[in-house]
Each structure stands twice: as C-alpha cells, then as structure tokens.
A protein has these predicted regions:
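Short alpha-helix in the alpha/beta-hydrolase fold that links the catalytic acid
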Residues: 35-40, 155, 179-189
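Primarily recognizes the serine-hydrolase "nucleophile elbow" in alpha/beta-hydrolase
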Residues: 111-162
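Conserved alpha/beta-hydrolase "nucleophile elbow" surrounding the catalytic nucleophile
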Residues: 26-28, 115-120, 172
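C-terminal catalytic histidine-bearing segment of alpha/beta-hydrolase fold enzymes
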Residues: 181-228
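Short, proline-enriched alpha-helix->beta-strand connector loops that line the catalytic pocket
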Residues: 20, 162-167, 193-195
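Alpha/beta-hydrolase-fold catalytic nucleophile elbow
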Residues: 55-56, 118, 142-145, 170, ...
Length: 228
C-alpha cells in the first residue's frame, strides 16, 4: 500500500460512526484545507453520517510554473493539455495514493459503494482517472472544472465495476485555466463510452458557483441515500 497522504477530515452527524466517505482532491497549488468550508455549505443533515477526507497532494516542481515546487497531483508540462506531453507517471502515482485512501476507508468500515471520489481541476482529473479504473463499484465521481487525463488509455484501462458509476461533471463557461470546450470534449468522450454522466455548465470562471453547490447537494443526496 502507498504511504497515506496527510489529510483534513470532517465528519457529519452527531458523533455517529460515518457510513459514507467523500474523498475530495484539491487543485494545483492548493491544499486539503481549500474545500474544507464546502461541508458547511451542503445540507447533509438527512443523509447518513459522512466522513469528508481532504488530502494534501505531494509537493513537486511544476513545469508550467517555471519549475516552482508546489502541491500538485502531477506535473503540467504545457498549457494546451496535449496528451503527448502529459505526466503519466505522476498521474499513476497519485492514483495509487488515492487507492490507499480508499483502502483506509474500507478498513474503517466504509465499503467502496459508499465512497464518492471528488475533485476540483487537477484533483478532479485524478478523481476521474482513479475512479474509472477502480476495481470495486464506487458511489460516484464528482469532477469539477476538470478533464479526463490520459484519455487515450481510458477504454483499455477502465474497470467494468465502474462502467455505470454516476458521474457529476461541471464547468464554468468563462474558465481560462481549463477551457470550457476542452472539458466538453472530455464529457463527450465519457458519454460515448456509455458512462451515465450529468453535465452541468455554469456562468463562472475557474471556480465553483453557488448554483453548483446546490446541484452537488442534490446529487450527493441521490448517490449517498440510505437505499442507494
């Protein structure tokens, strides 16, 4: 098992043992605290107790930022997200670390089918990459302001266990970090391969809109409902 990443953890409920988990991955240069406030913005009182896990990505030099060392799930070599220049090794290493976090939740009593993988930007890319290759059915994948990394390998590497996993994918029309049309191509790729994907566009930039938070809340109530 890969060494466990340090993480911020927040549990909902009144001290009851969590029955579900949301592993939420931050974006480039941020850390696990970045999305910590979103827990209070979601209306989760009528769901089973949830453990939110916000891991801190490892630090590494990022080529697009002049080699500056920052928290990143993988290196970004080019702003055009060319598949020929993707950091496949970094993506695979991060996927292994996410597998270790899932295994820890299993050890703490939460089965795979009650775990959501979530992420923003780079974190969303790793959530998609890891979730679609995971060997046990997950509750869902929440992919915000992101894209499918190593897209050419997905068809061959995707695991049948998650062929029908619910995917919530959202993007801002004004995103200049990961262009909207690039994210749309990732959406089209997943839909062409038969994944049950919900596509949510918003009038915002590279961020999360208030309307988006409400839609995430609705989606979480579907995939983490007691009888889901």
């Amino acid at each position: 098992m890969s060494q466990l990443l340090p993480a911020v953890e927040i549990e909902t409920g009144s001290g009851d043992q969590p029955e579900c988990a949301v592993i939420w991955l931050h974006g480039l240069g941020a850390d696990g605290h970045d999305f910590e406030p979103i827990v209070d913005e979601l209306d989760l009182d009528d769901l089973p107790p949830i453990r939110f896990v916000f891991p801190h990505a490892p630090t590494r030099p990022v080529t697009i930022n002049g080699g500056y060392v920052m928290r990143a799930w993988y290196d970004i070599v080019s702003p055009d997200f060319s598949q020929r220049r993707e950091d496949a090794q970094g993506v695979h290493e991060s996927a292994q670390q996410i597998e270790a976090l899932i295994a820890r939740e299993n050890a703490r009593g939460i089965p795979d089918q009650r775990i959501v993988l979530a992420g923003f930007s780079q974190g969303g890319a790793i959530a998609l990459h890891s979730g679609l290759r995971h060997k046990q059915r997950l509750a869902g994948i929440l992919a915000l302001s992101t894209y499918v990394p190593l897209a050419d390998t997905l068809a061959a590497e995707a695991h049948t266990a998650n062929r029908d996993v619910p995917i919530f994918m959202a993007h801002g029309h004004g995103d200049t970090v990961i262009p909207y049309d690039f994210a749309q191509r990732s959406c089209a790729l997943l839909q062409a391969q038969g994944y049950p994907l919900q596509w949510h566009p918003y009038f915002c930039e590279h961020t999360i809109a208030m309307e988006e938070i409400r839609d995430i809340d609705v989606w979480l109530h579907k995939v983490l409902a007691p009888n889901a």
